[in-house]
């Protein structure tokens, strides 16, 4: 079944408990979006287990540089070959997304055929796992707004674009 967006990311190892919790919160938020699929890339510790737990695709054999950093070209190649969606979105594995994300992607397509979508993020240090029960999005939005920590515009945490482009 064709999806709207394929998210793909190369998470850090899940060995540091705080980083693991942040990444798990983010990946879980992606899986709750309507009409998306998720691809996790790399063979870092814990990725295979998290992919299995959340029911997402996992491709461990992404090419890396000498330092072990995944190559963007390899990430894009794997995502293109293994996605079934109109849009691709390379995303940092600490970005929590909410349900308006998919709608913005769909509306962007109505504006023009070729585009790259990115945005400014709100910084928020999450100290515990998110309870993804009903109402989690409105509760998180309110908490984040109270902190009022809008990240400077230079952050590049995701790039969403039509699969047919770039």
Show the residue positions of the predicted features.
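Short, charged/polar "capping" segments at the starts of alpha-helices
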Residues: 16-17, 44-50, 125-128
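Conserved catalytic core of nucleotide-sugar-dependent glycosyltransferases
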Residues: 80, 96-166
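Short, hydrophobic beta-strand segments that form beta-sheet elements in well-ordered domains
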Residues: 36-43, 117-118
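N-proximal low-complexity "stem/linker" segments adjacent to membrane-targeting elements
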Residues: 1-27
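Active-site-proximal specificity loops/subdomain of glycosyltransferases
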Residues: 40-91, 98-99
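Short loop->beta transition adjacent to catalytic acidic/histidine clusters or analogous donor-positioning motifs
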Residues: 3-5, 28-39, 56
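Short loop/turn segments at strand-loop or loop-helix junctions that form parts
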Residues: 6-13, 59-63, 119-122, 161-164
């Amino acid at each position: 079944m064709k999806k709207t967006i394929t998210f793909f990311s190369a998470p850090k190892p899940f060995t540091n408990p705080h980083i693991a919790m942040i990444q798990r919160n983010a990946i879980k938020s992606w899986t709750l979006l309507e009409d998306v699929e998720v691809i996790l890339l790399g063979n870092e510790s814990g990725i295979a287990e998290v992919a299995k737990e959340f029911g997402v695709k996992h491709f461990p054999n992404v090419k890396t540089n000498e330092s072990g950093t995944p190559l963007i070209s390899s990430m894009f190649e794997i995502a293109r070959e293994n996605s079934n969606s109109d849009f691709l979105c390379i995303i940092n594995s600490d970005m929590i997304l909410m349900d308006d994300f998919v709608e913005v992607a769909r509306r962007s397509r109505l504006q023009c055929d070729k585009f790259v979508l990115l945005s400014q993020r709100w910084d928020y240090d999450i100290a515990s796992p998110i309870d993804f029960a009903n109402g989690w999005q409105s509760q998180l939005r309110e908490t984040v707004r109270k902190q009022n920590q809008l990240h400077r515009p230079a952050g590049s945490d995701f790039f969403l674009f039509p699969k047919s482009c770039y």
